[in-house]
Structures are given as structure tokens and as C-alpha cells.
Amino acid sequence: MPVPSALVCVHCSARYPTTHYDQDCPACRAKGISANLTVAYDSRPGEGLDQERPPHRPGSLWRWDDFLHASAAEAVSLGEGNTPLLHAPSLGLGDVWIKDESRNPTWSFKDRLASGALTMAKKFGAKVIASSSSGNAGAAAAAFAAKAGIPCVVFTFVGSAGPLVLQMRAYGAMVVKVTDKADRWRLQTLGVREFGWYPTSPFFGPVVGSNPYGMEAYKTIAYEVAESFDWDVPDWCVLPVCYGDALYGMWKGFEELKAIGWTRRVPRFVAAEVSGSLPAALASGDPMPPVTTRNAPTIATSIGAAQGTVQSLDVLRKTNGAAVTVEDDEMRRWVVKLAAKEGIWPEASSAAPFAAIEHLRAKGTIKPNERSVALLTAAGLKDPGPIEQALPEPPVVNGGLKELMAALKNSYGFNHG
């Protein structure tokens, strides 16, 4: 099993101690670039394993601990990972597959991040967990902190989705709301710097991404996808992107599989955004994604940031990928379509990859014979507002069969007995 030997800048490869997890890369910062760190190991992850007999430990993403920063025996786990990969031909998007992360313990992909981060928090002897979150990351941090027996403070903002905030509270987190979103980071920074609270989420700007040890757990999505396709990786991986933690983690996972000879190539990656920051950076060639001028609120609060990250931008460039700006009406339409056609109800942000695939197929970027995997990051129950706004009100029927059929026709266009 590999052992973490350093934290390395995702952009310039500068090396730092393994305890540098609460900071960005000072070398890049001096050049005006804000870059996250990633875990480097004393040996190549997965090297020496038999591809014909990959890990078969039951229960969680920690079956892949030969690729990770801690052992399954040390892990703080709630059975996260091993989510289904579902073929979705009814969507009209060609050979598209859904990696359904809504099946995780708190119903989002953030459970992987939380498990990876809390495992190291426990190893480091953390006394308090701190997270700044609009919902999913905070709920996951709260749940895994509860499992680890470590107090958790979550900073969120007034207006965050009610079910998500309730979920954080249900897991025992000390939830603090702020009026100004920037105050989340200011207060969390004070806790981290003054008291040594262990951060699982971004908490300073410009944002670089989340806890490097948490991001390692996202590599397992790549392992699961590759294994599901008998190690023939898809042509495209399409993700909803805010700060790009899962984007970077998946890319790193595919790179590791290629490095040990389990796969032949790495997929091209697509970031589905609402801000347009990454598309602007790809077009300009700048090393830093810009802060966009988009001020309108979005239904996709999980990806509502106004600025992308270097870690996202670098992955898109390295894989000859793409970034697509999606609109609220597109996501709302895809939420309804996914629920009605595939029986999967995603949160609004999780619908963004499908809108992006639609755009890229129309442009000819994604070819008809190419396979795409869309990461569905969280369940619609966490924020039901978008689909509620898009659906008709159920009719009230007082009467018999005639009245019933009239109501079904008027409300739903249903004409069959």
C-alpha cells in the first residue's frame, strides 16, 4: 500500500509536507496563480496488483485502499462508493451512461470526499471538523464527523436549501448561517488558523478546491467506471463543476490506471458550469479562470460559484476537454426528463452534464459513436424546488370515471383507459 510522502501542487508540482492540507501552493501564489495541492506517494498507487483480480473487499470505496492514502481498516466509512453505472439510451444522447452518486449514504458524491478527509482528520488527531457549504458537502461532513465521533461546524448562508440545512443539523453539526456568503470563509479561516479546526472544504479565496485527502477518494469513481467497462474507458466523462474536486480526482484516478497498465488511455473531460468561467479561460488561454460578471441567482446552487479553479482548467487542457455553460431552464428540463425517462430524480446541478452533452453532440464535438459517462452528483430530494416549479399541480377529482379521465386528460394529456 502506498504511503503519502508529500502534498504536490496540481499546477507547478512544488512539494510540501503532508500537513500542508489547509493551504494552497505558495510558489504559484507568488505568481498570481491560485493552485490546490494533491497527494503524492512513496510508491505508485496500485502497482503490483493483479488486474485480473482487482480488490474485492465488500462495502465501500475503501476496497481500493491500495490506491489511497489510508487502509480500509483505518477508514471512516458509511459504505460510500460502489454506485451503479446505468445505461440511459432513452435520453436521446447516444451511448450515455449515468454514474449515479445519489445512491451514497447522504445521497451525494460528497460522501466520498468526506470519507477521505475524515479518515485523515482522525489520523491527524483533529478535534473539530469545519466545512463551508451550500449543502451537500456540509451534510456529508456532518455525517462522517458523527461516525468519527468528532464535533463538526458547518458554515452556510441564509437562503440555502431547507432540506440540506436540515440534513446537516440532523447529523449533529453545529450549523451557522451568514448573510454575506464571504463571511463563511472568514469565520472558518478564524477557526482553522486560531484553533486548528480541520477543514474539509474550501475556505479562502481565490478558491483552489477542497481538502487534498478528501479529493483522493474521488479517484475511486474512475476505478469503478473503468472496472464496469472491463477496463475499456469511456471517451468522455462529463461532470457538473463548481471547484472541480471530483473532476480532478477522477482524472487522477484514470491517470493512475493508465500508469500501471490497466487501461490504454484517459477519457476527455467536460466541465458543465453555470458561470462560464472555465469556457472563458479555455478561450483566452489564461492560466487562471476569471471571475465572471454573472450575478443572477441559479437553481444549481451546488455549482453556483462565479470563478472556476486552476485544478479544473488544467484537467480540461491536459485531456483536450471542453467546458460548457448551461442555463437554468436547460437543467430544469433535464431534471424532469431524467426522472420521467430513467426513474432517477437528480438535483438541478446533476442535470447540467446532460445539457452539456446535448450541446456538444449538436456541435459535433462528441461524435455519434462515442461513449459518455455523466456524473449524477446528488438526489433531487435534497432540493426539490426546481422540479416542483416545472411540474403541473395534481388535479382534485370529485366524481366518477368520467371526471377522472377528464382530469387526467386536462392535467397530463392522458387519453387512454
Spell out what each predicted region is.
Residues 1-417:
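PLP-dependent amino-acid enzyme catalytic core
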